[in-house]
Amino acid sequence: MVKFADESKIRVSSGKGGNGCIAFRREKYVPMGGPSGGDGGRGGDLIFEIRRNMRTLVHLRHKRVYKAKNGGGGEGSQRFGKKGDDCIIPLPPGCVIKDPETGKTILDFGDAEEGRFVFLKGGNGGWGNCHFKTSTNQAPKTALPGQEGETREIIVELNIIADIGLVGFPNAGKSSLLDYFTNARPKIAPYPFTTKIPNLGVLRVDEERDVIIADIPGILEGASEGIGLGIRFLKHIARSAGLAFLIDLSDDNYLRAYDILCKELESYSKELAQKKRIIIATKLDLPDTKERFTELKNAIPDQEILGISLYNEWGLEEVKKAFIRLADEMQKTKPQKESLDPYGQNKNFMTAELDDVSYEEKNDDEHFGATVSLSRKRKPKK
């Protein structure tokens, strides 16, 4: 059986910070050099990287535990430890991170097609003993251990991002329509449930525009109660700009088909059921279908209904224009999203405008260094 990897449970951890060092300066003619232990390095971060060329989560099936490297320990002469290597997990666009216990969404990447996002920060490195020198303790033998990293179990869920989602009963012609308009080559055969996994195709409009079309397995009556394959994959068209309902005119239940599909979508998600749509009546080349097409338009007068025949290539240009129009309409009404800041990095740091930056160099036979001083601009009192 063909399996589509659209969900995976994994354990992720950031790295532990390196331990601070206890060391003392030991040089000739410097009998009491004082502490010189450096700080530990920061642990590596756990990072998700969105890659536009990925389509499934199959790579997460083979490995379930991901951990960033720990930071290196501090060393003498106030040398800091090495920062731990980050752990980067590649993901396809449209992923959502969920809590396995509550099912709540922790992080939604939205429509991002590329970029890196820190999910777990590495632990801070521990202080070396040079931080603990005081007027009464000139040779401290104290250092701090590195901060522990974070560990979480999460569910990574993939929701395919498409402009148009194709919805219909098995053998309604969804895969054939996808094959005609795009370079996708889904399996096409004259028996139900030929499509077992979602398929994506790209309808090329011009040099700057594409329309992404998603084909999911056929939906049966009672799908919301677990019958058939299609209901499991409805989440993959939940983010689509609009829906195309395909109704087979050669099926005797063609008049009930639209109502059944609407009912199953509403049972799954009211938001999905309210999306803009067009109705495509297929197999218009078969006997008695032209009369049925007229009856269908009379039965659903408030919806746009287009008739097509893939065999004779009737009405396909009108369907193409309808897909482009629907995608363009939703793009214009799409709200502008703020840039994703999943870990709140921008809120954890204080920013300041600097009024003056100065430094003083010290360079003699044994030492080289610099003292840097920063002065902050003060806000005027109101």
UniProtKB/Swiss-Prot annotation:
Where do the OBG-type G domain residues begin and end? 162-328
State the needed cofactors, names only: Mg(2+)
Amino-acid positions noted as binding GTP in the UniProt annotation, renumbered to this chain? 168-175, 193-197, 215-218, 282-285, 309-311
Enzyme class of the recorded protein, top EC level: hydrolase
Subcellular locations according to the entry: Cytoplasm
Q: What is its main location?
A: cytoplasm
Matching InterPro entries:
G_OBG, GTP-bd, GTP-bd_Obg/CgtA, GTP1-OBG_CS, GTP1_OBG_dom, GTP1_OBG_dom_sf, OBG_GTPase, P-loop_NTPase
The entry's keywords: Cytoplasm, GTP-binding, Hydrolase, Magnesium, Metal-binding, Nucleotide-binding
Enzyme Commission number(s) of this protein: 3.6.5.-
Residue ranges, annotated region (Disordered): 360-382
Residues binding Mg(2+) are 175, 195
Indicate whether Nucleus appears among the record's keywords.
Answer: no
Single GO molecular function: magnesium ion binding
SUPFAM superfamilies under this entry?
Answer: Obg GTP-binding protein N-terminal domain, P-loop containing nucleoside triphosphate hydrolases
GO terms in the biological process aspect are:
ribosome biogenesis
Stored Pfam families: GTP1_OBG, MMR_HSR1
Family listed: Belongs to the TRAFAC class OBG-HflX-like GTPase superfamily. OBG GTPase family.
HAMAP family this protein is in?
GTPase_Obg (MF_01454)
Q: Which PANTHER family match?
A: DEVELOPMENTALLY REGULATED GTP-BINDING PROTEIN-RELATED (PTHR11702), MITOCHONDRIAL RIBOSOME-ASSOCIATED GTPASE 2 (PTHR11702:SF31)
Query: Mind telling me which NCBIfam families this protein's record contains?
Result: Obg_CgtA, PRK12297.1, PRK12299.1
What this chain does, per the record?
An essential GTPase which binds GTP, GDP and possibly (p)ppGpp with moderate affinity, with high nucleotide exchange rates and a fairly low GTP hydrolysis rate. Plays a role in control of the cell cycle, stress response, ribosome biogenesis and in those bacteria that undergo differentiation, in morphogenesis control.
This protein's assembly is summarised as: Monomer.
- The molecule here is called GTPase Obg
Look up and give the organism this protein is from.
Treponema denticola (strain ATCC 35405 / DSM 14222 / CIP 103919 / JCM 8153 / KCTC 15104)
